[in-house]
């Protein structure tokens, strides 16, 4: 009998080994991918990348908004949220007692969702709220996030689109088994708990989308082009009515139907042994039961849509600036003709040499124009967007866009552009291969869209064989008169509804409790990974050039890409004309090249040149294929010092700038950014220190260019990352980059300083929306101290840094007050400056008071638990142990350290000190540096919808206009 048992075990092991050795691969695959299919249909995509001991993981479920029931739109998305709530084994301290309450909540929602009488609904919701509180007594909030923090995962998140729901983790390479055990339990045994508070978080996400006018345009375009397909019939976030009337039963059925192995792919890129990884995945996911009906469910969607025969014009309204979008139906990403979509996108709009770039943007015929694909699995929408100049109608913009489409159809483009497109695709591929997330995401895209990996590997080679005649023929077949035309107007959206907040009792979170499942995972011993700290003396070089400028050098021995930066110690605070000059030069040619030729040459070389100006320095960046570096450096020199001024171009730029300034006041996020800078730095800040309209009009464009040319006279640091050896690069750059023999030194760190907050006050700026953006900002003038950084890191991790932190639990999990909330003790950019502290939240207008009260409570009486401290410490320690500062990041790390007066990697101090920090030390930090602070409350919102009495109780209210915070 024993022999039979042993034989069975050996046989099972052999079968497992045989299964793990069966995989698909493709010749000449730069990622050397392995693709496995388990017996239950689960797809596993693996690619090894040894850059650092971490692994990017994506678990992709081939289901999204298009698969939502017509009467439960938004379902796939809020199931994504619920997947973080745990299982029967974690997220609970007694599932047997919790389950009857959860079942009762489920049944009440089935009654609630069909009731229309407001009083009846309120009474039922009160029952749901009461039961939810009782159920929370047996739940443990955020145990999934505790698990991820405990194993050192980063980037815990998920996303839902029309075609996929995908779950992301970036894990240490020694935690594969723990990760697999957690995920298999999560995907087989999901439990819906904390439902009504999470639904409020989803609704807050919906509120944020209501001021996203671009989203409205895309959704309207889809509805026109695909009226018989879910792409056009429903949205990923769902309707307001459906979100407020959910069905837990329907969500469970959705999970049962779609979250099955033969509809899922595990996609991984990083440092691992693929044989070991597939064995672990087979161990934990191999017994997952498939659903034989999932293919028929997927195939139930309509395959074709009746094409339009004439333009279908729609109008949408919202707070942002006017624009127009034209859209054409294209084949889906799984179609071979999708190759044409990629190349047409580049021909029309690539940022430099496309038809839109040259004929519309460079020629300043519109404020801005762009084109690109909204590529989906079953169908795609090719979109063009245009924003009008001052006095220009949307119809004028429409005509200009259509004229460029006609040029494409007529073949009125240079055939050599096709070769340049291929070179740029190769450059983009090199960049993607450096990133584990990009590599793993390519797997997700292939799986979701049903694309054979061989086709993906051969994509660039295949596209390179497409001829100009092929493109013209295809363009004429798809760019017909049957297109969607969406006019976006400024105004109130009639489809929006104002919904009052529900009465929610904060649920129990039990931060001090831990389920046995979590305890077992956290106690599992894994082989330690030792940290490797960057050594600036060994991992890079610092040298002085002949003119005493500095060179920071790091060799790229990975691929054929280069990066050069000229960081010039003169910024907008010293010269407010620089920003305008950097913008102006983008429209100009040189003594050798017209503006169009210059941009086309850059694109042909597959390289970039950019000018950016911040308060203390100007950065000129060059990047691209290393084989073309010398040509690009020469082009940049010619551009900087011999740009050909043009009065007409400048006059157009001024007019467009004034229009763009007016438009900026219409965007909620932009308004909040300006409010934040105004309140934190004062009326004179990076945003307001700009030329007035009168100064713009009075400026002589010839004089403006001198501000760029004269940058050569100022001290600069040259940063190089590329294949060239240091001696060779030094000789080359000294010979080919024009600089003064005796550059003028400028004070480093000439930036705007944070304003102290000696007393509480409220600064209120107007914006008419369903939600507020709010920051509580505090500066008690505490100067930077390097020895305080470990405590700061630990406090941020514990208090406000992520989904396992206190802020997330109290504001979102327990109360459903926000989709996004955070708090940070911030480290200044320079050693001369101060630490500051802020909280941040986006919430429905009538939840403002609750948000403020909750922040006050946890800021001044911070819950302190040993288990949460240990998790915060573990997360920091594992993150540092497995992160590697490599490639161009070494140079960035050096600059950051030097700005703080350090000559070493501060991560070493954090790692060595955090491991020994106690709960008492954390509480002492909170008492000394956080508790009892005074704040400036920054609020962007509609005052008519806010509790002004609450604001008055906080401190004096200062109402500021958009004109004040924008400076015009």
Region locations from a protein language model:
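Proteolytic maturation boundary segments
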Residues: 7, 16-46, 273-317, 322-323, ...
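M16 family metallopeptidases and their MPP-like homologs
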Residues: 47, 52-65, 74-76, 92-185, ...
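Active-site His/Glu-centered metal-binding helix of metallohydrolases
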Residues: 75-83, 581, 795
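A common structural junction motif
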Residues: 185-192, 284-292, 402-413, 638-645, ...
């Amino acid at each position: 009998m024993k022999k039979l048992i042993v034989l069975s075990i050996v046989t099972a092991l052999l079968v497992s080994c045989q299964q793990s050795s069966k995989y698909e691969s493709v010749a000449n695959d730069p990622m050397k991918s392995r693709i496995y299919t388990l017996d239950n249909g689960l797809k596993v995509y693996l690619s090894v990348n040894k850059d650092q001991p971490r692994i990017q993981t994506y678990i992709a479920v081939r289901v999204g908004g298009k698969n939502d029931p017509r009467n439960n739109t938004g379902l796939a998305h809020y199931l994504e949220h619920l997947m973080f709530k745990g299982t029967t084994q974690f997220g609970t301290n007694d599932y047997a007692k919790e389950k009857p309450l959860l079942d009762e909540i489920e049944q009440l929602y089935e009654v609630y969702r069909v009731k229309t009488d407001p009083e009846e609904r309120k009474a039922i919701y009160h029952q749901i709220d009461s039961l939810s509180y009782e159920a929370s007594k047996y739940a443990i909030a955020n145990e999934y996030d505790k698990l991820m923090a405990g194993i050192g995962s980063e980037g815990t998140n998920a996303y839902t689109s029309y075609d996929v729901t995908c779950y992301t983790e970036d894990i240490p390479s020694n935690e594969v088994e723990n990760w697999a055990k957690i995920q298999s339990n999560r995907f087989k045994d999901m439990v819906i708990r904390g439902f009504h508070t999470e639904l409020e978080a989803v609704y807050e996400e919906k509120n944020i989308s209501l001021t996203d006018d671009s989203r409205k345009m895309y959704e309207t375009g889809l509805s026109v082009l695909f009226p018989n397909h879910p792409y056009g019939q429903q949205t990923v976030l769902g309707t307001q009515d459906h979100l407020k009337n959910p069905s837990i039963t329907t969500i469970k059925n959705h999970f049962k139907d779609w979250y099955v192995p033969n509809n899922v792919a595990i996609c991984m890129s990083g440092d691992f042994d693929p044989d070991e990884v597939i064995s672990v995945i087979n161990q934990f996911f191999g017994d997952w039961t498939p659903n034989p009906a999932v293919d028929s469910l997927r195939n139930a969607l309509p395959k074709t849509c009746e094409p339009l025969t004439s333009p279908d014009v729609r109008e949408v309204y919202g707070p942002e600036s006017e624009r127009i979008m034209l859209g054409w139906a294209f084949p889906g990403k799984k179609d071979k003709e999708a190759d044409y979509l990629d190349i047409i996108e580049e021909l029309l709009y690539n940022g430099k040499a496309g038809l839109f770039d040259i004929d519309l943007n460079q020629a300043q015929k519109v404020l801005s124009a762009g084109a690109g694909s909204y590529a989906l699995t079953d169908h795609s929408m090719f979109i063009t967007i245009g924003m009008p100049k001052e006095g220009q109608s949307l119809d004028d913009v429409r005509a200009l866009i259509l004229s460029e489409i006609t040029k494409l159809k007529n073949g009125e483009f240079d055939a050599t552009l096709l070769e340049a497109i291929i070179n740029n695709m190769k450059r983009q591929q090199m960049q993607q291969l450096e990133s584990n997330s990009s590599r793993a995401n390519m797997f997700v895209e292939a799986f979701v869209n049903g694309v054979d990996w061989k086709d993906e590997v051969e994509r660039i080679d295949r596209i390179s064989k497409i001829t100009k005649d092929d493109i013209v023929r295809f363009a004429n077949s798809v760019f017909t008169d049957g297109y969607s035309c969406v006019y976006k107007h400024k105004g109130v959206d009639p489809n929006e509804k104002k919904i009052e907040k529900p009465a929610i009792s904060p649920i129990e979170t039990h931060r001090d409790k831990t389920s046995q499942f979590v305890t077992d995972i956290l106690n599992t011993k894994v082989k330690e990974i030792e940290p490797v700290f960057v050594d600036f003396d060994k991992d890079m070089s610092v040298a002085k050039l002949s003119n005493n400028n500095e060179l920071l050098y790091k060799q790229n021995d990975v691929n054929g890409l280069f990066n050069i930066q000229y960081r010039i110690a003169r910024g907008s605070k010293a010269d407010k004309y620089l920003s305008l000059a950097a913008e102006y030069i983008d429209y100009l040619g040189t003594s050798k090249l017209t503006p169009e030729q210059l941009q086309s040459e850059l694109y042909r070389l597959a390289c970039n040149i950019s000018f950016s100006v911040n308060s203390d320095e100007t950065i000129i960046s060059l990047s691209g294929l290393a084989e073309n570096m010398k040509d690009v450096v020469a082009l940049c020199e010619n551009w900087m010092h011999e740009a050909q001024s043009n009065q007409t171009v400048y006059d157009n730029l001024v007019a467009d700038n004034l229009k763009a300034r007016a438009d900026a006041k219409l965007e909620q996020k932009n308004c909040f950014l300006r409010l934040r800078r105004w309140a934190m730095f004062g009326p004179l800040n990076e945003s307001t220190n700009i030329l007035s309209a009168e100064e713009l009009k009075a400026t002589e464009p010839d004089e403006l260019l001198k501000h760029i040319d004269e940058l050569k006279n100022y001290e600069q640091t040259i940063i190089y990352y590329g294949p060239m050896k240091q001696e060779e690069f030094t000789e080359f750059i000294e010979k080919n980059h024009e600089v003064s023999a005796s550059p003028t030194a400028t004070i480093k760190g000439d930036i705007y300083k944070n304003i102290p907050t000696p007393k509480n006050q409220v600064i209120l700026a107007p914006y008419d929306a369903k939600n507020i953006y709010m920051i509580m900002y505090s500066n008690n003038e505490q100067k930077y101290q390097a020895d305080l950084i470990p405590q700061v890191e630990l406090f941020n991790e514990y208090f406000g840094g992520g989904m396992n932190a206190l802020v997330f639990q109290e504001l979102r999990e327990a109360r459903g007050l926000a989709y996004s909330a955070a708090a940070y003790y911030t480290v200044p950019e320079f050693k001369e400056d101060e630490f500051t502290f802020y909280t941040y939240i986006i919430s429905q207008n009538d939840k403002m008071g609750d948000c403020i009260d909750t922040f006050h409570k946890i800021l001044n009486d911070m819950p302190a638990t040993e288990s949460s401290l240990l998790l915060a410490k573990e997360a920091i320690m594992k993150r540092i142990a497995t992160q590697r500062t490599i490639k161009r990041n070494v140079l960035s790390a050096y600059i950051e350290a030097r700005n703080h007066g350090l000559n070493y990697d501060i991560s070493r101090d954090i790692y060595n000190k955090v491991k020994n920090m106690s709960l008492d030390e954390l509480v002492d930090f909170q008492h000394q540096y956080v508790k009892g602070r005074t704040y400036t409350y920054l609020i962007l919102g509609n005052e008519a919808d806010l509790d002004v009495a609450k604001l008055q109780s906080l401190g004096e209210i200062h109402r500021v206009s958009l004109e004040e915070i924008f400076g015009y």
